[in-house]
Amino acid sequence: MLKSFCRKAAVLFALVFFSLPVFSVSAESDANRSSSYLYDSEGNVISAPQSYVYSNTVTASDIGTAEFGELVDIANDKEGNIYFLDKKNSQITVTDKGFKLIRTIKAFTNGNEADSFKNPSGIAISDKGNIYVADTDNGRVVILDKNGNFIGSIGAPDKKESQYVNQYKPSKVEVDKSDRVYVIAENQTQGIFSFGASGKFMGYVGATKVKPNLAELFFRSFASKSQKKASLQFVPTEYSNIAIDDENFLFCVISAVDGKALSEDIQSRNGTVDPVRRLNQDGTDITIKNGSFPPVGELTFDPYVYGSYAGASNFVDVAACGGGMYSVLDSKRGRVFTYDSQGNLLYIFGGRGDQRGQFNQPCALIYNGDEILVADRSRNSVQVFVPTEYAKLIKSAITEYNTGEYDKEYESWKEIALNFSGSELAYSGMGRYHYNNAEYSKALEYFKMANNRKYYSVAVKKYIAQIGRNVQPFVISGVIVLFIAFKLYGVIKKRRAKAPAVRRRTKLTRLSEELKYSWYIAMHPFDGFWDLKHEKRGGAGAATILLAAATLANVVFIRFKAFTFNTFDPEQDSAILKGIEGVTIIVLLWCVANWSMTTLMDGKGTMKDIYCYMCYSLLPVIIMLPIATVVSYVLPIEGAALLNMISTVGIIWMAFLVFCGTSATHNYSFGKTVATIALTVVGMLIILFLFVLTITLIQQIIAFISLISKEISMRT
């Protein structure tokens, strides 16, 4: 009989399980997503005004020269001249800012001999106007003046300087204001080559150390010396491109990023995976990551899916725009992501496709004034994008903040917010303005609108201190008045003292005593629970009131704790339902499961006894959650650990009372109590599973009946 029932249950479960639709959490399709969007502070995709719009496309025919063979890089100088690097034809095409041909550099004189490039991959222009070319297959960096005359070259470091260079093939090059040269070479993972102005090898910068997991450490402990030495050679990071900003720091990007690790990093918001880095002269990463998420490009992607449009962003270039702003180019989706100096995402534009403003194989980008130029390798063309008023306002606000023009900055953010109500960045900017003017209440409003909990926390501290200074005289006066009143009350009470009147024991009086008894139980759990059952010191009515109070405390904590620590969205969820789920449902599940288990384990408690001791055990929740709610309003964001500790103390205290209540009610030993609690938890999970299964079956039956009825109605 039992075997037959089990077989039927298993078949039924299998049918239901495999008939359920497969749900997957995925972002909006990349193919259908608008090219103008943003991510809010919760990682949700939101529509945003256009930041940069397509202006025109530049090809070799537009310049008036032979077709490009393979356009791989672009650069510009201080005069606005544009340099197009053609890898296949091994030449440089130079135009003015209007894309009129100035010259083509294909060959040059090196000493007394003719020389030329061989499959060059990268180009950079110094502040002096000199041209630096990563001459890949010749294994050197060629330096030319602005007219294309040979100045010199930088070859590979010798073996004494670098033991890791086997075949030196530079792919990207950059030069700073001091003429220090930085080179990325193919298949070199020790970092970026750094050369002095004279061409002397200075060492590597930006090398990334490996963080092996436990399995790698385990196998490494059994490896030989040669195996350990070999294992060091495959792990460091290989950069894909570099750029120098206006403060002479080095921006670099990484294209090969572990999608799974990056996805976990986005969820935790730790910023430990760094596809974008800003390095100082020592090679230390000084990238600021104060944004809601680290600067990683796309936030919503499937880390287990790979392909032309799937997975993490693939950064192939980076360009600095001044004022700490920078843009990175994602070749996977053809999008440009722009961030400010704090790591806040400002705007996104571009996309993959054949339309104007879209790319097939984007490979390089530069700023030319306010314009952004993006090179497309497969089309052998450059698309020019111009900023909209929205992008200009953002840049103006950032520039005005950097120069100390805070009133103008506020007006810029205000205009942005008027045209784009979803701009959390604008609300943060306005909140910062009010904060700097000591208008903390207004600052709190804007920081809350911006979902900026960090600055909200800082403003709360200032606001509380400001209120404290304003009400301090009234508080002192009130304390004095209360002290005097308390003393007078004591004197009057003594004078009017009489023999205690005989109290009449009513239902209300008994209920009050039963509620007060919950405190005795909290302080003396073993004696308290024994008397609760055997001396009838409590009742179901008081237990129900305690259950309702605990549920209410949970609802208030979920809904009304300070914004600094509160991620609850009343538009998406119900605090009442969450409060009931967190307390009432758990208590009821416990009662049913515990009664079921103790019935089989010679328990002495009835269902009423179990219900009473469980509800009386909730007093710590009733005490600690309101305390945590109030304390949350005076704690900074760094006080999250203290807030968690307060609620954790309540939960641990409650768990101890549940243990004592189970032991006293059922007259169990320590070991049997532990076993009963463990089995009760398992029973709760089974009941919950059966409940969900029943609901699912009912839904399937209703859907089936609905489908049949529709089919019948259509046939008739």
State each model region's role.
Residues 28-411, 415-433:
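Eukaryotic scaffold repeat domains enriched in small/polar residues
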Residues 402-403, 436-437, 470:
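Register position in tetratricopeptide repeats
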Residues 480-494:
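Alpha-helical transmembrane segments
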Residues 508-608:
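Selected alpha-helical membrane-embedding segments in polytopic membrane proteins
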